[in-house]
Amino acid sequence: MFGSFGVLIALMMFKNQHPLNAQLLFVWTLMEAYTVGVVCASYTAAGQGRIVVEALVLTASIFAVLTAYTFQSKRDWSFMEAGLMSSLWLLIFWGLFSWFVPSLAGGLYSLFGALVFSGFIIFDTWQITERFGYDDHILASITLYLDILNLFLYILQFLSRDRH
């Protein structure tokens, strides 16, 4: 996890230096895939493999619908930025606090996380089409990848809340 974060920082620093940026994106993607693979394998080993598939289908469906809506709407979604960033900080602090108080409304936390990253999918898709330049493909990949990945993990957490 910390290695992945380190590669992500390096990726952000060298986002415009080709081919290093593509190589770092490849390494970071492999590290994230391994991490998510371990999470999914642990659910499967616990007899909850069906939940992983349900979370995958829900994530893909939500992403497709929100992306289509964002492209179709032609709205300026910049007003969402402050609220999404505030919500992200709330999720971070809530997650840290829940380490000390584990029963702190886990279902509500995961549902809120899924809603926040659904909002990020709309905002970042709009940002890619309206704010990002032609050379920002690495940054665009990272933002949507993180949105989809986090949405999947929060949905997975929400679906498994009563099945532990």
What are these regions (language model features)?
Residues 1-164:
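A hydrophobic alpha-helical transmembrane-helix feature that marks the membrane cores
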